[in-house]
Amino acid sequence: GKPCDAEAVKKCLEDLVAVHERAAGDLKIDSMEADGLVLTIHTTEACPSLMNYLSEPYGCIIDVDEGVTEDGIVVGTGPFVATELVTDDHLNLVKNENYWDGNVNVDEITVRTISDGDTLALALQSGEINAAYGMAYASYPVFENDNYQFTSVQTSRSFYVQMNYASP
């Protein structure tokens, strides 16, 4: 694949704010400077949540030269390559032979969309799936035991706030 340097990230973010109204409003990008692996972002105003916004799902860094396929697949920077996307059903991934961080120890992954909470719980219990996200609260007791590794957080997003009490 192509290198993911600051110029590639800059190009991706320029495209993002051009086509995504919310991203443009959130990020408040005035200008950017790319230098090797360092990207400097200048904003139109103070934007203390910039790092949080860059980690939003819309902020995924993709190869904009490759674009988005008709079925929604993009070229990214991760350890897997998408081979098939069927909206509201599944996403098939295979290991990226050119992954920058070396060998990927899983050959393929299928990410299934299971929107019904009971169906999701039953699929996990039966071994049909190996992991789940967005489990219904009512199902928690079933998985809070030694047979499962269960983690729960109140939100999928977190924010860091710092106050400067020395400045008015």
Annotate each predicted stretch with a short phrase.
Residues V94-E97, T155-P168:
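A bilobed periplasmic-binding-protein/Venus flytrap-type ligand-binding module shared by bacterial periplasmic
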Residues G25-L27, P141-S152:
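Ligand-binding "clamshell"
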Residues K2, N98-V142:
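Ligand-site clamp/hinge motif
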Residues R22-V64:
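Surface-exposed binding/hinge segments that line
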Residues G1-H20:
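Aromatic- and charge-enriched surface segment that lines or borders ligand/interaction sites
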Residues L27, G36-V38, V75-T77, D88, ...:
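Extracytoplasmic
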Residues E14-E21, S55, N98, Q125, ...:
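Sec-exported extracytoplasmic/periplasmic mature domains
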Residues Y53-V104, E108, D118:
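Gly/Pro-rich hinge or "lid" segments in bacterial periplasmic/extracellular proteins
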